[in-house]
Each structure stands twice: as structure tokens, then as C-alpha cells.
């Protein structure tokens, strides 16, 4: 697997990239994989929309083993799970962020301060560090992480992408 790509931080981001940058929890990727789960259509739709729009999705490398584990346990299909992991890792708009000692410490602080599960805190730390919206199917994660980052369900993320189009008024003298 290629090394994680570097993501620029700071004030040089454009307003478009600030409003359409996401950290997507494994719960959404797993839900999008299984057409029999409630919410599958919205999870698949937000992943498709970010890909088609080229919107940055910045996730911890932890995403990959989480997907492999959940898909294999639900389907007993190791090869299919690993194929999905490979396809996910290869997405051009997806950036994998390594769990460095600094990120791990930030996640630990979030876990302790907001009673987040360990993996949930890692996603929240990545979202906070890169100024992204955390998209998750996990109600507890969204509720607890919302103290530090913007959190949305896939349905909410889809709605927020739909901005009203402005029409030009003609000026008459």
C-alpha cells in the first residue's frame, strides 16, 4: 500500500474545500457495502457524491481494518472484504492519515474528555485536525464528538450538499 498522502492544513484552503471536506466513519462505508442494511442508500449516495464531486475525504488508516473486520464478520467473505478495502484505499479523493503519536494523543484526550470509544475518538481527532465534517451512522459517536467537530448522518450530509441555486435578476432601468 502506498504511504498516506499529506493533507495541507492552514488558511490557504478555499471556501469550497472547507465546506465540502469530510471524515467518513467506517460505519458509513460498511453500511454502503451491505444493500440489506437500513440507511444503505444514503450511505452509498454520500460516498458516491464525494467521489463524483472530487470532495476530499480524509480518514485515519484505521478505516481499512475496520472495514475488513466488519465486512468479513457480516458476510464471511474474506476475499470480498479485502477487495472492498483495496478499492476504498485506491479512491483518488480519499486521503489516509497515519495514526502518529501526536494524533493518538489528541484522540486519547478526546476519548477521555468526551467519553468516546477509542476508534471513534481517532475519527474525531482527524476531523478536528483537518477541519472536516465527521459523517457517521453511529449515534453515540456523533452525539459525543459534536462537542468538538461538526457531525452529520449521511442523510444530513447529502442535504447540506444541496445548496439553493441563485437566479440572476435582470435589471431594468
Segment roles from a protein language model:
Residues 28, 63, 103, 122-123, ...:
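Alpha-helix capping/helix-boundary segments
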Residues 35, 61-62, 86-113:
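Acidic catalytic patch
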Residues 24, 58-59, 98, 118, ...:
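Short beta-strand scaffold positions
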Residues 2-21, 96-97, 124, 128-173:
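Acidic, PIN/NYN-like endoribonuclease modules and their adjacent C-terminal/linker elements
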Residues 2-59, 74-86, 159, 163, ...:
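Short, well-structured N-terminal submotif of metal-dependent ribonuclease cores
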Residues 79, 95-97, 114-116, 139:
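Recognition helices and adjacent regulatory flanks at domain boundaries
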Amino acid at each position: 500500500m502506498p504511504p498516506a498522502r499529506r493533507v495541507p492544513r492552514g488558511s490557504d484552503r478555499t471556501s469550497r474545500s472547507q465546506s465540502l471536506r469530510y471524515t467518513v466513519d467506517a460505519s458509513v462505508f460498511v453500511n454502503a457495502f451491505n444493500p440489506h442494511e437500513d440507511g444503505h442508500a444514503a450511505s452509498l449516495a454520500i460516498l458516491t457524491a464525494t467521489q463524483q464531486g472530487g470532495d476530499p475525504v480524509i480518514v485515519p488508516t484505521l478505516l481499512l481494518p475496520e472495514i475488513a473486520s466488519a465486512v468479513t464478520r457480516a458476510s464471511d467473505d474474506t476475499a470480498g472484504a479485502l477487495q472492498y478495502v483495496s478499492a476504498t484505499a485506491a479512491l483518488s479523493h480519499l486521503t489516509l492519515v497515519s495514526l502518529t503519536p501526536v494524533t493518538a494523543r489528541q484522540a486519547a484526550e478526546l476519548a477521555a474528555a468526551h467519553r468516546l470509544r477509542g476508534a471513534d475518538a481517532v475519527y474525531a481527532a482527524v476531523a478536528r485536525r483537518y477541519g472536516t465534517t465527521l459523517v457517521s451512522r453511529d449515534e453515540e459517536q456523533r452525539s459525543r464528538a459534536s462537542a468538538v467537530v461538526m457531525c452529520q448522518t449521511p442523510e444530513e450530509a447529502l442535504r447540506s450538499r444541496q445548496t439553493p441555486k441563485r437566479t440572476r435578476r435582470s435589471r431594468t432601468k
